[in-house]
């Protein structure tokens, strides 16, 4: 039946499990491990209940009276093990997304572009930007204090003199390194020199061709970035392309042209290039749209994404919800340091409060503060999320857009409240869980 199971094995399930009947499916949610499986009939539910009661595998098998029931049991076990929903003799191991172990560095405000939608409003170097030596020390202290991941952006990171040294240092001390770049300043020699020190790199292309990209990023840039994308990918660096369309360059055939871009780039690379579409326009240099307009924008972008890959939503959802990986927060508490050393606990730094400067306190101080903020605004400590069985799968949403404190905590009275959740949104989330599960797993073949 299953090479890893013996008849005297007992499966251990997390204690808090909720079942929801959605259309013809039964969604089984393990609340405390942010996990779920989908059952297709009442037979499977009955068999699951026996396993949860502590029946040995062999005892369940002995009670089975038909081929249909046996097939249902095999599919149930396959689902349980595919999602690590239970353990043999032990409970499943939980992991947590810990945003306070991640560091986002806006290393300079200088940029060679003046993009209309830039939420950092980058362009000119700040008067008091930190030095190379400052950043080397900050990274070392971050690692010693338990830091794991660092993302460099700007401005344009390559505009910072000595960026190569910082990049190498971050890699050499064991940090996972991500770089966000506009892709225009990378020479052949720089790419070959620095690629070994980068775990992941993301480039921005905000149009489907030279003409539409130029509307946002200026003329003559499109082909340069595409070439940089191809070179990094072919050197084995995990490479992605992030696209933020604006209403100025969205056209009737954008979906067709965007798919052509995706196909053209992937044909030239030996490794997969990941394409990401921004589904929200943040307040930027020349962009500030209402929430209603953003909903329309999001719907349009999701349509483009679906045209390129009809299963993209399912794939992204499953990829973002690994079994037993608990998301208690949107990421608030993760540290962002601006070029002048100002510290924030969200990467949308111009919409939240600063908590001081890295030149005034050690990194460990800010990491502890970030952990504190991460916990006090987690779904365990906000209303009504703390009572919701979907809380660790949903994470509560954006602490700026979806909460009463709008990302600003200093003068806000507890309890913090999520203000955008509805029964309809919960139902959509559960339907998405089912559809993604059905797309990704097939236990009947």
Predicted regions and their residues:
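Radical SAM/AdoMet-radical enzyme domain recognition
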Residues: 103-104, 120, 132-153, 160-279
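Canonical Radical SAM [4Fe-4S] cluster-binding loop centered on the CxxxCxxC motif
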Residues: 96-133
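Flexible glycine/acidic-rich beta-alpha junction loops that bind and position SAM and/or redox cofactors
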Residues: 248-250, 269-295, 313-326, 350-354
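Short, small/polar residue-rich loop motifs at catalytic or cofactor-binding pockets
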Residues: 328-332
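Long, charge-rich, low-complexity alpha-helical segments
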Residues: 39-106
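Local cysteine-cluster metal-coordination motifs and their immediate loop/turn environment
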Residues: 110-120, 345-348, 382-402
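C-terminal accessory region of radical SAM enzymes
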Residues: 236, 292-323, 348-390, 394-395, ...
């Amino acid at each position: 039946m299953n090479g890893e199971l013996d008849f005297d094995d007992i499966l251990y399930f997390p204690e808090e499990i909720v079942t929801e009947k959605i259309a013809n499916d039964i969604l089984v949610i393990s609340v405390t491990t942010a996990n779920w499986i989908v059952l297709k009939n009442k037979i499977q539910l009955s068999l699951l209940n026996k396993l949860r009661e502590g029946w040995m595998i062999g005892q369940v098998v002995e009670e089975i009276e038909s081929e249909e029931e046996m097939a249902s049991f095999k599919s149930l076990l396959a689902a349980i093990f595919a999602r690590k929903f239970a353990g043999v003799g032990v409970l499943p191991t939980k992991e947590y997304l810990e945003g306070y172990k991640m560091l986002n560095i806006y290393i300079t405000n200088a940029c060679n572009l003046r993009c209309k939608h830039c939420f950092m409003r980058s362009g000119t170097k700040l008067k008091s930007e930190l030095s190379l030596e400052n950043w080397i020390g900050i990274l070392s202290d971050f690692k010693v204090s338990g830091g794991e991941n660092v993302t460099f952006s700007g401005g344009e990171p390559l505009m910072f003199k000595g960026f190569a040294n910082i990049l190498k240092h971050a890699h050499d001390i064991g940090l996972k390194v991500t770089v966000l770049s506009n892709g225009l300043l990378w020479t052949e020699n720089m790419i070959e020199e620095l690629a070994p020190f980068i775990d992941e790199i993301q480039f921005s292309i905000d149009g489907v061709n030279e003409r539409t990209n130029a509307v946002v990023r200026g003329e003559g840039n499109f082909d340069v970035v595409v070439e940089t994308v191809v070179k990094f990918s072919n050197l084995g660096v995990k490479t992605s392309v992030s696209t933020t369309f604006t209403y100025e360059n969205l056209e009737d055939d954008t979906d067709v042209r965007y798919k052509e871009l995706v196909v053209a780039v992937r044909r030239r690379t030996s490794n997969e290039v990941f394409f990401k579409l921004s589904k929200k326009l943040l307040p930027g240099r020349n962009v500030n749209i209402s929430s209603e307009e953003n909903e329309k924008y999001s719907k349009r972008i999701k349509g483009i994404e679906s045209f390129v890959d009809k299963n993209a939503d399912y794939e992204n959802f499953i990829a973002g919800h690994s079994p037993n990986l608990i998301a208690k927060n949107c990421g608030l508490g993760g540290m962002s340091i601006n070029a002048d050393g100002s510290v924030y606990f969200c990467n949308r730094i111009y919409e939240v409060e600063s908590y001081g400067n890295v030149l005034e306190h050690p990194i460990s101080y800010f990491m502890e503060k970030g952990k504190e903020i991460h916990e006090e605004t987690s779904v365990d400590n906000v209303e009504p999320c703390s009572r919701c069985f979907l809380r660790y799968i949903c994470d509560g949403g954006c602490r700026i857009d979806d909460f009463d404190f709008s990302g600003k905590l200093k003068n806000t009275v507890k309890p913090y409240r999520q203000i955008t959740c509805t029964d309809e949104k919960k139902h959509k989330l559960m339907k998405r869980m089912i559809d993604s599960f059905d797309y990704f797993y097939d236990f009947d073949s």
